[in-house]
Amino acid sequence: MNLQLDYFSITSFLVFLVVLFRIVSDWNKKSTNLRLPPGPSKLPIIGSVHHMIGLDVDLPYHALTDLAKKYGPLMHLQLGQMSLVVASSAKMFKELMKENDLAISQRPVPYVARVLNDAGRDIAFVPYGDYWRQIRKISRMELFSVRKVQSLYYIREDQSNKMIDAIGGSAETVMNLSKAVSDYTSTVVARAAFGSGCKDQDKFIKLSLEMVAAAGAVSTLPDMFPALGFIPVLSGKKAFLQNIQKEADKILDYIIDEHIQRTKSKDYDGKESDKEDIVDVLLRLEKTGELEIPITTPDIKAVIWSVFAGGTDTSSTTTLWAMSELMRNPKVMEKVQAEVREKLKGKKEILEADIQDLPYMRAVIKETLRLRIPGPLLLPRETMEPIEVDGYVIPEKTKILFNAWAVTRDPELWENPESFIPERFIEKQIDFKGTNYEFTPFGSGRRICPGMNFGIANVELPLAKLLYYFNWQLPHGMKPEDLDMTAKFGVVCGRKNDLFLIPTPYNIEVEN
């Protein structure tokens, strides 16, 4: 009996080995025939996932940079059922974003976006096609044009004054700058999206911040292994996310209905106005009949969520990283404060029109976006057809990931890339509008972030005021080099821990 059992066990094991060998052989043969970019070896089912063991997976852009050093600037990874090509050099960025921009204009829809049921209308993930062209045109010409962003100056001035007053109330004591900046940015975005004085605005802001944080915490496993979609269900994260959205949707329904009722009043003339918020603009365009594809209430909600997800954390994160780097680099802080205080000398109140000639402060912002890029991995693209890049063939429906963090720290492109040196942007004119592929914090090509003008405007004024009105100290006698600069990866890559500083009011000599 034991002999029969042993024979059966040995036979079963041999059959298993033969089957496994065939699977691995077929896998390798298929990969070889595709002429894919180089990458780590792949196992059946899990692909290249095992190569991530031992790497810094909490900050995946670190792990991908380490792998790229071994396999090159164009690298193929098989993560479960996800076929992924990672670009990690400015040259590969240009090859993909410029030479193959149309072929990779599709965006893969992540699991978390599908959970929220707005993936087909969200600005970031809307499928390439007629509706994408329409919402893209609306975004660039109406919602986030230079003129429209400038017209919202009064919101930024008002909210930044409130931020400065709040900080002044904590003078000479340790205060949470992260909270002050986050409150400023989220309120500016809310007022730009649906106006001021709306019912439950503060509650919606709170829910939106919870939504962004919860979305960043949802596992990416269902994207790699669709069969594991039950994990966020069992963990309760899917239900938690949907409950937040359901509660926030009730507020948005009220806001949108309130705007619709306003358009029905006899005083409404249907004309464009500098005081229009995003909901006003969308309803005006719909009412004029200028749109080829009608905009529905779910569409308006999706746009608002896009604005909050893309505009709130990104701007506040950039401002806080800038202040963090300035605290770590006292000489840079001294230089930028000298510029701001010299140009604005004697002004008791700073207006947005006053900060147009601050080249060094703008260089500080650019250097922050380089060294502490809020989105170190740009939102992925997806090939709509096979493409050839650098002699390799990338099949249709392959996801393309851009490791911008690796590019902005490439020693071949940047001298002393780990150091905070704003002067590099004074000496060499490099912009972030998508044509300098060594510096693409907002992406490039057809899928470049349409709200970058809005995002930058939400950084410049508050940063100028923080530098003008206060001198800053680290708490508890901390030395600059001891300031915690640990990052946390999520929807954006911000500080892991809040930034606590001591503000001291600057003695302004007011001009007569």
Swiss-Prot record:
Which CDD domains is this protein grouped with?
CYP71-like
- Regions that span the bilayer: 1-21
- Where heme is bound, by residue? 436
Required cofactors, per record?
heme
Recorded GO MF terms: heme binding; iron ion binding; monooxygenase activity; oxidoreductase activity, acting on paired donors, with incorporation or reduction of molecular oxygen
- The answer to keyword Heme applying to this record is yes
Instruction: Please verify whether the record's keywords include RNA-binding.
Output: no
**Where is it chiefly localized?**
membrane
State the GO CC annotations.
membrane
Family of this protein: Belongs to the cytochrome P450 family.
Protein purpose: Monooxygenase involved in the biosynthesis of limonoids triterpene natural products such as azadirachtin, an antifeedant widely used as bioinsecticide, and possessing many medicinal applications including anti-tumoral, anti-malarial, anti-rheumatic, antibacterial, anti-inflammatory, anti-pyretic and diuretic effects. Catalyzes the conversion of tirucalladienol to dihydroniloticin.
Give the protein's recorded name. Dihydroniloticin synthase CYP71CD2
Species this protein is from: Melia azedarach
